[in-house]
Each structure stands twice: as structure tokens, then as C-alpha cells.
From Swiss-Prot:
Record's signal peptide: 1-29
MF term (GO), any: nucleotide binding
A Pfam family that the UniProt record links to this protein: GFO_IDH_MocA
Cofactor: NAD(+)
Organism of derivation: Akkermansia muciniphila (strain ATCC BAA-835 / DSM 22959 / JCM 33894 / BCRC 81048 / CCUG 64013 / CIP 107961 / Muc)
UniProt-recorded name of the protein: Glycosyl hydrolase family 109 protein 1
Length: 481
């Protein structure tokens, strides 16, 4: 494709047809109907970037890195969005000691009732449901006055709901990504600072057993000084396009059609960023370059699986099947970030972290280094039998404490339960969250930055500093006991 053709194609995607997102709803894990016809923000290829400077902190606002809220004996939790993802959180939150589910909001009454049924079965108490439109969560906030809200609507609603619940007095815990634009991320950061409420993007992968163990190994210096990381979200999800009226595919498909970059970066990036202490005293995000492959798979899938006049076959899919980005940190370290939700290939998040003394990698779990095994770093230590001594020595204390129960509870191998458990534990003990609002903003900002870079032929994009320089004062995430 020549440059002029590529440019025309890009410019054609700048607008989203009115009502294109109207199929969205609170119904799915990350799903809500829009307030009004709303456009997905697509960067102008002639613009130098989304934001290369940052606004000053507002009067009365405080830096939230390491913030400790007053202890809560019992945490009253409400939910906005209880579809596939939100309902999973409901089932697990209902059994966590010290948490009480006090309200459930969703556009679909049947799905709200389904989650209320789960809570009643597990606890004997039935929470009220709120299903009178997309802003009924505000009525819920006024009536039940929750301490914390789990925010699981569609991406277009993350910013609005998250900011509203903080302004109405609750800590906010929002599904990934935190928001879809740099502007929205700044709004969330500012609201958290002004209200002095926690806002944590719920990156569950940081609580996986492998990820926790690698964090423990990195903190103990097993692989020396960190140099390089590889992160990814490789997950074939074309089948979601069959969710035409309700479900993730009913709204997410439009993102594949109208954007071109890494639209879902945080699952792979979150753990790598915390291994490296990015935005925590040692180092920070610097700049990013990004490239996308041709966009072929979604159109081919639509043609094969839907009638010729189906709405999916009327879309001109812009998002490359594979996006590859490289992040350069302020210390000069590099991170590869890949994204592909279209190609027929096995699932992977890569999860590779390389240091001066060795390398830890995922998919499959394998390690090599001067301090590992017999020191033969020319071969991986992999497989259940060979890795057993590694897990025995370096398993994270948090996983040792919670892991067995988490495995019984399920949720992506237990990581979901560990995450929710830690949220409640931190709120009850008045501890800082394991992931602060700035980390969620940095990790999520890769999406729009990658779109700008792709649109400009791979030109570098500077990360906004959501901490306004205060990352240098933020302690690295320790090894939680």
C-alpha cells in the first residue's frame, strides 16, 4: 500500500458513525451504552503527539503515589457493570472477609439480578440493583454510599464513571484499560488527586503466580541489573464478533475498525513495568515507537462468518492484526510490547525480563542465569520437575499465603482473587495500593501513543509524566508478605 493510500485510509477512520457504539451496554465485563453518539478519538497523523507537556497540579490536590486512606473495618463495595467480567468479580468479592456488596448497577435488569442472586446465595444478603439507565450508578452512589466501586463498563465509559464515583466519595477500581485517551487519563489522575481517593486500574496479571515469583526474584537481585523486557497480549478473540447485540464484541469490534495501534497493552506491560520500577523512584517511561501490520484478519473473519449485508462486513477495518511497539525508559532500558487479538496462534503475554545475570521468561515458564540451577545459562530451566526448586525457593510470600485459596476460587488461575483480596486488605489496613493511579495511566497511555506513532510512520512519541515529576519520590513496590 503506497503512502497516499495509507493516509487516505487513516483519515477515513477519523469519525465513527453515529450510533456505532450504541450497541454497547453495562452488560459485559467492560461494557456500557454511551450517553450519546460518541466518536472514538483517532489521532491526527499531522499532529506531533497527544501531549508533550503536562498541566500543573490543581490547588488543594495532592500527589497520590504511596497514598494511605483511613482504615476501613468493613469495605462497602458497589459494582457498575456486571456482565462477563463484572459478574466474575461479584462472585469472588462476595466471599472476601471484610467486604460487603451493597449495590449492583447494570443496564440489563436480568444480568443485575443474576449477580444479586449470586451475592444472596453466598452471603444471605441481597444487594439492591440499579437498572434505570446508563447514569443510574449516580442514584446507587447516593442511596447506598459505598466505600469502593468496581467499575466494569465499556472502555468509552471508564473515565466518566471512575471520575464520578470518586467525586461522590468512593475509591475507584476500574477494569483495563484505565481509559482510551491521554486526555481522559489526565482527568482521572486529577480527580484522584483532588478527591484524595484511590483509583487503581485492576491489572490482574500482576497477581499471577509466575509474575509474583519473578517480581520476588528481581527484588532479590537474582538476574542482576535489569536491561530489557518483553510484554504482549496475544489472544485470538475473533469469536467475540459473534456478540452482536450484547457482549464485548458488540462494542469492541468498532475499536478494531476505527483505530490502529495497540488497543489493549496493559496485561503484558503491567508486570514488566513493576519489575523495572517504572514510575517508582528508579526509572520512568520515556518515549515509544510503534508499527502495525496490515489489517486483514478481521475482515476475512467477517466475510467468512457473517452475511454480506451484515454490519461487520460494512466496516473498513483499520487496526493492524499485529502491533509492535518499543518503549525507551529514562534510564535507557527498552521494553518490547506486542498486541494481536486476531491471528490464529497460541495465547501469550511473553513476560520476559532480562538482566545482567540472567533472564526470566513466560509462555512457557522458563529461567536461565548465572545464579540459577548449575549456572548453565545456555539452556533454559523449564518443565515442572526442573522448575520445582525455583518455585520452592522464590515463590512470592503473597502467593504462598493466598495462592491455595485463589486456585480454588479460580479467575485466570487465581490472579483475579488475589487482586481483589489485596484491594480489600489494603483498604482495611490503610495501606497504599499495589498499583497506583499513575501506573494505570502510564500503562494505558501506550494505546493512544501507539496510534500516533503508527499514523506518523513510527515516529517517537513522548510519554506524558502523569506524576508531574513525583515518580522520583515513590517507593518501589515491595514484596508484600
Amino acid at each position: 500500500m503506497d503512502n497516499s493510500s495509507s493516509r487516505r485510509r487513516f483519515l477515513q477512520t477519523l469519525g465513527l458513525a453515529t450510533g456505532a457504539l450504541a450497541a454497547g451496554s453495562f452488560a459485559n465485563a467492560q461494557e456500557v451504552a454511551p450517553l450519546a453518539p460518541k466518536k472514538i478519538t483517532i489521532p491526527d497523523p499531522n499532529n506531533i503527539g497527544p501531549m508533550t507537556t503536562w498541566p500543573p497540579r490543581k490547588p488543594g490536590a495532592i500527589y497520590m503515589g504511596g497514598f494511605r486512606a483511613p482504615k476501613l473495618d468493613k469495605v462497602r463495595v458497589a459494582f457498575v457493570g456486571v456482565g462477563e467480567r463484572g459478574s466474575m468479580h461479584v462472585g469472588q468479592m462476595a466471599v472476601i472477609e471484610g467486604a460487603e456488596i451493597v449495590g449492583i448497577c447494570d443496564l440489563y435488569e436480568d444480568w443485575a439480578k443474576r449477580s444479586a442472586d449470586v451475592v444472596e446465595k453466598k452471603t444471605g444478603k441481597r444487594p439492591p440493583i440499579f437498572t434505570k439507565g446508563p447514569e443510574d450508578y449516580k442514584r446507587m452512589m447516593k442511596e447506598v454510599k459505598p466505600d469502593a466501586v468496581i467499575v466494569c463498563p465499556s472502555w468509552e465509559w471508564h473515565c466518566r464513571v471512575t471520575c464520578d464515583v470518586m467525586k461522590m466519595g468512593a475509591h475507584a477500581f476500574v477494569e483495563v484499560p484505565m481509559a482510551v485517551s491521554i486526555k481522559e487519563l489526565w482527568e482521572i489522575v486529577d480527580t484522584s488527586e483532588e478527591t484524595r481517593k484511590h483509583c487503581m486500574m485492576m491489572e490482574n496479571v500482576n497477581y499471577g503466580r509466575e509474575e509474583l515469583m519473578y517480581l520476588n526474584m528481581v527484588r532479590q537481585g537474582v538476574i542482576g541489573d535489569l536491561l530489557y523486557g518483553e510484554a504482549a497480549y496475544i489472544h485470538e478473540l475473533r469469536g467475540q464478533m459473534k456478540q452482536v447485540e450484547r457482549g464485548t464484541g458488540s462494542w469492541r469490534t468498532y475499536h478494531y475498525a476505527k483505530r490502529n495501534g495497540n488497543v489493549y497493552p496493559t496485561h503484558g506491560l503491567g508486570p514488566i513495568a513493576q519489575y523495572m520500577n517504572l514510575a517508582r523512584k528508579d526509572d520512568c517511561f520515556g518515549r515509544l515507537v510503534s508499527f502495525s501490520s496490515p489489517a486483514l484478519g478481521r475482515a476475512a473473519y467477517a466475510k467468512k462468518n457473517f452475511p454480506a449485508d451484515h454490519k461487520w462486513n460494512k466496516l473498513d477495518f483499520a487496526c493492524g492484526d499485529m502491533n509492535t511497539s518499543i518503549i525507551k525508559t529514562t534510564m535507557g532500558r527498552t521494553v518490547l510490547v506486542e498486541w494481536d487479538e486476531t491471528s490464529p496462534r497460541p495465547y501469550s503475554r511473553l513476560n520476559l525480563i532480562q538482566g545482567t545475570l540472567g533472564t526470566l521468561a513466560g509462555f512457557p515458564t522458563r529461567v536461565a542465569g548465572e545464579k540459577l540451577g548449575n549456572g548453565n545459562y545456555h539452556e533454559w530451566i523449564e518443565g515442572k520437575e526442573k522448575l520445582a526448586p525455583i518455585f520452592e525457593k522464590y515463590d512470592h510470600p503473597l502467593w504462598k499465603r493466598i495462592g491455595p485459596l485463589a486456585l480454588k476460587m479460580g479467575g485466570h488461575g487465581g490472579m483475579d482473587f488475589v487482586m481483589l483480596f489485596r484491594i480489600i486488605e489494603c483498604l482495611r489496613n490503610g495501606e497504599p495500593m499495589d498499583q497506583n493511579v499513575y501506573e494505570g495511566a502510564f500503562w494505558s497511555s501506550v494505546s493512544e501513543l501507539s496510534e500516533y506513532s503508527v499514523a506518523q510512520g513510527g515516529m517517537p512519541q513522548v510519554f506524558p509524566d502523569f506524576t508531574r515529576g513525583d515518580w522520583k519520590t515513590t517507593a518501589p513496590l515491595g514484596i508484600v508478605q
